[in-house]
UniProtKB/Swiss-Prot annotation:
Gene3D superfamilies on file: Cell division protein FtsQ/DivIB (3.40.50.11690), membrane protein fhac (3.10.20.310)
Subcellular location: Cell inner membrane
Annotated membrane topology: Single-pass type II membrane protein
Periplasmic side: 51-258
Protein's UniProt name: Cell division protein FtsQ
Provenance organism: Alcanivorax borkumensis (strain ATCC 700651 / DSM 11573 / NCIMB 13689 / SK2)
Gene Ontology cellular component terms for the protein in this record: cell division site; plasma membrane
Family: Belongs to the FtsQ/DivIB family. FtsQ subfamily.
Residue intervals annotated with topology Cytoplasmic: 1-29
Keywords: Cell cycle, Cell division, Cell inner membrane, Cell membrane, Membrane, Transmembrane, Transmembrane helix
Lineage: Bacteria, Pseudomonadati, Pseudomonadota, Gammaproteobacteria, Oceanospirillales
Domain of life: Bacteria
Amino acid sequence: MAKNAPAPRGARRKPVKKVGVPLRERVATAVPWMLVGSVAMVSLLAVIYLPAALDGYPIRKVGVDGVTDVRRQQQIETALAALVREENYFSVPLEEIYQQSQGLSWVEEVSVRRQWPDTVVLTVEERRPVAVWNESVLVSDSGQPFKALKQYDLDDLPHLNGPEQRLEEVMGFYHSMGKTLADVDLSIRSMEVNARLTARLTLNNDMELVVDREHYTTKLRRFVRLYRGVLNTDSRQVARVDLRYADGMAVTWREQQS
């Protein structure tokens, strides 16, 4: 095998070029680390400055729509004061506010929302009381008892009294008799019902009616006909009308009581 020939005298070896990493690859490699660094920096700045930024949007007001009495307005605002104190627009606990509001006995339904930049707004549907039951609770128009005597004016509500377990039946009597009496512009101011469901009604003209549950609708209609034809002109002189008779009624005049 022939030996390598020596390089000619005076000839120089060409330097070997180092092949570098292309710029595109260097940039591609560096970008993820740059992004990681940027995200870390943003996160650090958020931790440092975000609380201070959010403190610039504190909750200053609680708006309540749908509440028709200042007593109930004040009660709901007082109940929510601790939940919104020191809270900001973004951190205010809407679910807790909803639960606290819905827990008030006179609230039928409520919705809660934020209103930029510093307000929580509640839209409330109130329970509408139609009667006072046994001087201890109110009864809503859907027949549900609820405790809120101090939150309503009771003078304009009829006062119904009867066996605790007979509320539904008593309310049925009240609505049915009230509808019949309304035909002659009479209304029930109070009603006492005993265990046998005999009712004593005091009307808005101070007249007292006594009626038992047997055929009470027929008996009330008979009274309405008599009232429209005879008793209306002297109704203030009538103290009591007893309707517990199959075919008639007993009228007691005020002069008879004195």
